[in-house]
Amino acid sequence: MLQFSFQNCKTHTCYMNTSVNEHLDQDESFLRILIDTRKKIRSSYFKPQTFDEFVHCLARVRAMKRLVSICSNFDEEDNWNGVWNTLVVDGDSHASAMIDYEGLLDKCSLSRNLLELINDYAEYTTQVLPFRKIPSSDNLDSSLNLTVASPKSNLYYRYSSESPKYAKILDCPDEILQLIFSYCYDASYIEKLPFAFSYRKQRHTLIHDLPNTCLRFKKILSPRNVSFWKRLLKVHKKNPNSAVTCSESINTSAVAKFTDIPTIIPIFLDPSYQSYAAKTIHSDTSSLASSIIQTGDGTQSCDESTYIELACNLVGRCVLCNRIPKLTKFKDCITSFYRPSVATNICDQCLEAIIDFYEPVSRYKFDVMKDRLGVGYISRPGQKFPSWLSEHVQLARDEEKAFKSIYHSQGEFARSLFRLFRAQLAELCEQ
């Protein structure tokens, strides 16, 4: 049993409590859209209707199994085994009699653990998967924060005696996306070409509100990143109609201190990403240029290859930084750009910045993160504190690799399995 310590970050605890309470119910309509979208994603995951959906399911299963195989928290395992072995070796019959080992394990382990559920789905059974109950932690005392290792799966779950709530595999509550938007959406950014010169002169919530651990994202917009600014300056000189120049003064008073969470993202919320992929990947550079930027009169399009390269390869279009996906030779590159668990497009660099923000949050306020996420935490070997978002990134990368492998190398075999899956599903519906 572990006792989590938050002594290193007491100064941030009050800030996190206030911020979480501020943004939970900020936009009900946006939250409703996300809930509906994620319902569609979950239904398509458990009952894929097309071959592409089926391949995505297989890729997700393979990624989950790989993640489970490499995830084992050695610190917790050693501590738990140490407590167990101490009692056994010492032969303290009185202490052993006071602890109900069997009852303690029954409360913390699944009747069928997560790995067995994944194996069931990997065998293409059509039964509804039973989900474990995850207790509420609203009034959970810190002394009851137990982390116990399941002897079969090396996964670690949180337990309390409070009233349970239900959670599903790969199920992340919608509040997490609202927090992501609230903390990482930069309200002061106005889309201009080039955005860099105005960006460097203003104070921005995205950069300044992130902890010092956010190194990757800071390096991109750092004044010391000379090559980055040279590329943008080159683009700026080739586009004289740009409204902002390096010497212009910026009216910071006109910048809104706060704007609502952006809700105009219908194309990013579409679980079937094929329509968006067709519009971006299969379009030629001329149409891409005209869709990216237009000059002041609105009639001539920019055909500068430098800017196209910048817009396509620098960050990519996402709901946070508003750039388009990278154009690669793989048509399914959009699958890693679209994040199924949060039902929206987030580029790798913004997601890394989000992770850099949430990892320290989970360390100094574990109860809040556990309550908001509602899922068991797992961590890699050598990672002392568990965090959900880092595993989400690893899962997305593994899923992308698995999708390419299945689709290109095992296509015929996957099609045979899909026919078998549909046949079993039809038999189940007839019953």
Swiss-Prot record:
Keywords, sorted A to Z: Cytoplasm, Endoplasmic reticulum, Nucleus, Ubl conjugation pathway
Annotated InterPro entries: F-box_dom
Domain of life: Eukaryota
Coiled coil: none
Pfam families on file: F-box-like_2 (PF13013)
F-box domain mapped to chain residues: 172-186
Compartments reported by the entry: Cytoplasm; Nucleus; Endoplasmic reticulum
Cellular component, GO annotation: cytosol; endoplasmic reticulum membrane; nuclear outer membrane-endoplasmic reticulum membrane network; nucleus; SCF ubiquitin ligase complex
Presence of keyword Nuclease: no
Induction per the UniProt record: Expression is induced during oxidative stress.
GO biological process: cellular response to oxidative stress; regulation of ergosterol biosynthetic process; response to oxidative stress; ubiquitin-dependent protein catabolic process
Quaternary assembly: Component of the E3 ubiquitin ligase Skp1-Cullin-1-F-box (SCF) complex. Interacts with skp1, cul1 and erg9.
Protein function: Expression is induced during oxidative stress. Plays an essential, SCF-independent, role in the stress response to hydrogen peroxide for survival, by negatively regulating ergosterol synthesis via direct binding to the squalene synthase erg9.
Name of the protein this chain belongs to: F-box protein pof14
